[in-house]
């Protein structure tokens, strides 16, 4: 059976959403929203959307046939049968108001994802950290095995050139977002929980116990024959395990893990390790990603693939040839500066644990390099809630350039801004950070800071990623020239 025939057979088994032909997305430029929109375009729905600015996601959707509006306006929703919104959208948005007046159904992003998953074999990946990488690895393993899954990922899968794709099989692999508790809409066949930490606590009323219980509820959305794949190395995940009334597969470095990593060794961007699985032969693996945290992500993917009887040869090849994800320890090249050549890496991590994992991976892979970090805090609330943790983690680099907080629409909070954080790190006495009041000042400061052999790490979830790419392309007047090809 050809891929086309297989897809047509699949479509005949999946009922279309009744009366729904035209779907409008408010905030379509986000990775999660754009990914769902791309799948729906390819399923034949008429898709439109709006966002405040043009970006790579909106450009790609335009090429696929979606109608994109830059800016929000009531007229944009007039022909829609349903309107999809993300949590970031203000309820007073004119398109939301117009949809309510016109009695057009308004659904959250996760509700639309749940609809896509309803008649498929869903694999949902949740957790405070590692969702995007784990989802990407699972999608790559299934693709390598010829399963041709549909996937929706919160970052660009480099090998596919996109963060979403409509496959021809019954599989749908997707991130599950706990930030607004909307992952409770999903009803997958397999659920992964990578870890649980205090983040997005406003959603849970500042109650960590409520957050933990919500993860348990998420796992109980599995059918009684479903599988929960959980990281036993995470203390909070281990704590909630007795409450999970579903079949579980555990993974980690711990001796009691069902899928265990042994003999870990990192060299540069790659890791080697042995995976031990109950009832299966050990596998010696090469992972084309740096850091122990990425080995944990790979173990989750291996556990899911092994449970679904994917051949070991596909696992071995997919991990060794994995091309990475955009903004996840993404190597952008080596560059000549006035004082010598430096290596530029860009990473999305913005929680203290994520930043710590990135620093650890950089130290392990390039132990002789001086680590220079340009860090942009993300959200005032996160900076406030995890202030002491940020002081501890950011003090671990050799040189710190600290940008002002990227607000993500939040109002400033006194004492939780970049200048205050910079002052607190300086008072700790381990590091003397440089405060960057405006992003456009970064390129002015770097030539005086960087030295021969440095590893420059741009870190954060705001517009620091765009700045990093502008640096790589020398678009900010930064007096460097690429000495190696910049990777996408």
From Swiss-Prot:
InterPro entries recorded = Mur-like_cat_sf (IPR036565), Mur_ligase_C (IPR004101), Mur_ligase_C_dom_sf (IPR036615), Mur_ligase_cen (IPR013221), Mur_ligase_N (IPR000713), MurCDEF_pg_biosynth (IPR050061), UDP-N-AcMur_Ala_ligase_MurC (IPR005758)
**Residues bound to ATP:** 127-133
This enzyme's EC code(s)? 6.3.2.8
Gene3D superfamilies, per database record: Mur ligase, C-terminal domain, Mur-like, catalytic domain, NAD(P)-binding Rossmann-like Domain
This entry's Gene Ontology molecular function terms read:
ATP binding; UDP-N-acetylmuramate-L-alanine ligase activity
Q: Report if keyword Lipid metabolism is assigned.
A: no
Name the GO terms of the biological process aspect. cell division; cell wall organization; peptidoglycan biosynthetic process; regulation of cell shape
Write down the Pfam families for this protein, in alphabetical order: Mur_ligase (PF01225), Mur_ligase_C (PF02875), Mur_ligase_M (PF08245)
Which pathway does this chain act in? Cell wall biogenesis; peptidoglycan biosynthesis
Where does the UniProt annotation locate this protein?
A: Cytoplasm
Entry's family note = Belongs to the MurCDEF family.
The protein's name is: UDP-N-acetylmuramate--L-alanine ligase
């Amino acid at each position: 059976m050809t891929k086309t025939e297989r897809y047509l057979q699949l479509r005949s088994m999946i009922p279309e959403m009744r009366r729904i032909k035209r779907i409008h997305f408010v905030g379509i430029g986000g990775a999660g929203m754009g990914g769902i929109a791309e799948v729906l375009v390819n399923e034949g729905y008429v898709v439109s959307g709006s966002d405040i600015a043009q970006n790579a996601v909106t450009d790609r959707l335009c090429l696929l046939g979606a109608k994109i509006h830059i800016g929000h306006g009531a007229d944009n929703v007039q022909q829609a049968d349903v309107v999809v919104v993300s949590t970031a959208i203000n309820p007073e948005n004119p398109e939301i108001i117009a949809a309510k007046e016109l009695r057009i159904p308004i659904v959250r992003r996760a509700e639309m994802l749940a609809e896509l998953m309803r008649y498929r074999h869903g694999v949902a990946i949740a957790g405070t950290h590692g969702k995007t990488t784990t989802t990407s690895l699972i999608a790559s393993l299934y693709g390598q095995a010829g399963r041709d899954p549909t996937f929706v990922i919160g970052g660009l899968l480099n090998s596919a050139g996109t963060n979403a794709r409509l496959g021809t099989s019954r599989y749908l692999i997707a991130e599950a977002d706990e930030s607004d508790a909307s992952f409770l809409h999903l009803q997958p066949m397999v659920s992964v929980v990578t870890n649980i930490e205090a983040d997005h606590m406003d959603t849970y009323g500042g109650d960590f116990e409520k957050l933990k219980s919500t993860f348990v509820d998420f796992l109980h959305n599995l059918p009684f024959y479903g599988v929960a794949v959980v990281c036993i190395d995470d203390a909070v995940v281990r704590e909630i395990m007795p409450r999970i009334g579903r079949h579980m597969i555990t993974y980690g470095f711990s001796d009691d893990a069902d899928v265990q990593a042994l003999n870990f060794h990192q060299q540069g961007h790659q890791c080697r390790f042995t995976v031990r699985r109950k009832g299966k032969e050990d596998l010696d693996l090469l992972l084309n990603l740096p850091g122990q945290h990425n080995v944990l992500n790979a173990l989750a993917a291996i556990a899911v693939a092994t449970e679904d009887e994917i051949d070991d040869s596909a696992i071995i090849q997919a991990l060794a040839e994995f091309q990475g994800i955009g903004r996840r320890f993404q190597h952008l090249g080596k560059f000549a500066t006035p004082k010598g050549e430096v290596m530029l890496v860009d990473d999305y991590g913005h929680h203290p644990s994520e930043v710590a994992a990135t620093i650890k991976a950089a130290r392990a892979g390039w132990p002789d390099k001086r680590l220079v970090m340009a860090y942009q805090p993300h959200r005032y609330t996160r900076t406030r809630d995890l202030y002491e943790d940020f002081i501890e983690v950011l003090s671990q680099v050799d040189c710190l350039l600290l940008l002002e907080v990227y607000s993500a629409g939040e109002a400033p909070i006194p004492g939780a801004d970049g200048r205050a954080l910079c002052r607190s790190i300086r008072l700790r006495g381990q590091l003397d950070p440089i405060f960057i009041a405006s992003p456009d000042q970064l390129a002015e400061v770097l030539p005086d800071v960087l030295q021969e052999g440095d590893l420059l790490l741009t870190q954060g979830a705001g517009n620091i990623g765009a700045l990093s790419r502008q640096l790589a392309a020398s678009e900010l007047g930064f007096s460097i020239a690429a000495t190696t090809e910049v990777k996408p």
